[in-house]
Amino acid sequence: SGGDGGGDPQPGDAPNDGNGGVDYSGTNVQELGVDEPDLVKTDGERILAFGRGKLHFVDASGASPALRGSLDLGADTWDAQMFMHEDRALLLLRTWPTYAGDGVPAPAGQLDAQKWFGQDYWSSILRLVEVDLTDPDNLKVVSNLYITGDLVSARMIDGVSRVVVRSAPSGLVWKDPSELFDYAAYEAEVGVGNWDEVVYQKHWDIALQKSKVYNKAIIDASKVENWLPRYVHEDLSGGPAKYSTGMLLDCETVMHAGVYSGLSMLSVLTVDLNASLGLGKGVGLFSEGETVYASKDNLYVATTPWNPANADPNANPEQQGRTTYVHKFDIKSRDQAKYVASGAVRGALLSQWAMSEYQGDLRVASTDTLGWDSSTSESFVSVLRQDGDDMMQIGQVGGLGKTEQIQGVRFIGDTGYVVTFRQTDPLYTVDVSDPTKPAVVGELKIPGFSAYLHPVGEGLILGVGRDGTLEGQVTGMQISLFDVSDKASPKQLHKTTIGNDWGWSEALFDHKAFLWWAKTGMTMIPLEWSNYDEQTSEYTWEQGAFGFHVDKEDGIQLVGEIQHPQPEPAPCVDEWECGYSWTPVLRRSLVIGDLVYTLSDIGLKASALADLGDKHWVEFPQ
């Protein structure tokens, strides 16, 4: 949704204006004005992209794009992300500890975790990298900030980024009940090789109690250093590298929600790209965190803890099911974020699209299932409103897609669109104009399902998903155009399928792989599928970026397909490892002027926007 939870305009509808007045597309984001990190960024004149383990600067301001500089990051960049603001870039890299051995330095560009975090730290490390873009021919890393933890997600508004990090406690060795189970006592009671469920449960309960006592003692003996994330800051702004290290958060900035939602530490860091990279002015909250959503005013982090009753077939149904806890942070200030409230909804969330703020309230779409029994599945749309430090549920509608799971969701203005699927695809329209009384007002049942929904005009939504049979068998990739101008009667106007039953697209689970260019009514998505050759009995892997023209009257028409050149086969290492080649996967599309650029790990290709004909190829160096 864009603006205030879905008000016009929508992200992607209105082109951005570059410094030279050239229209260009940015990252496909959920909220207008709230940037999301991605593996490629542009301002209409410059393109920053990850590929082959490097950051590449491509000048797109001239008649043809030109590679100006590449920066070796010493890290895998497949899931790397970044923000770009004026002459600074903030890179977000997931890394793992490198232990080269005593007295052996870590590889170039990697942190010696053994030196800084100790030999007992084996979890993930988040690396924030500040890059100076002033001289494209000589890109420079100004500073690195290494944090013990994993990136959950990030957002940026007007050059101020909020980075959400989840850090598990370190140096604490828990004991699971299975480690304390007295198998000798159990076998002495029932006999070797015999099974007795009642006796087993008795001994399991004893082990569970021992585990609780043991782990509580571990917690009681722990120190603050076990709970707070650690950091190493590397300043490369001038002369030899300067290092500092310590705890990322102060105790005064760590909060505890009124509901238990895990033992990890959530850190919300504030990094202003107009200033140098410091320690992030973090605020902490004891909680797990998996899903991040942000409006211009608030950032929400959601987590769905494991419920042990779901694995117990004898548990009371009232004890089963899932609960999602949502934590709210005020980000209106350009300075430190502020934790303000927490709330809960029944069920689990599909993705960030399951949350949307509108007129101060948070709408949440969720699916709940009791234990492993899928016949109990049911979906809900709930509305939470802040009251002090609580987010109270003020309205809810349930009964959506019974026995099914949410596969796609989008809130636009005062309406929610929820797709569930098991056999057919019900597209529900949910009226949330009265937040205290949300109501399902329309339903459309069709084969297949849409995993991603995107507004493409007044009363029109484009869906990207999978086709299917009436029996629920999923087939190839599908693009559908829906008319939702009448909430009570949504209609599928057009659909097209592409590929075969093995078809797949990154756009199914990552909206940033989807491009909508409203100016010409064109959408582009990456697609992959395999074909079986009966003559050779071999499978071939096909892939490319496909462009479609979308029109209410004319339907969905294929404009063309873009493919990248095959890389040169790898040189022979020996007779067993010779000539290995691979097909680059096209992952992103963006528009600048009358060109559409597609990105793979090996390069950028510029094609004509009108017909997707080849124009220019920029290969990334090895």
Where are these regions (language model features)?
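Beta-sheet-rich non-transmembrane sensory/scaffold domains
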Residues: 1-622
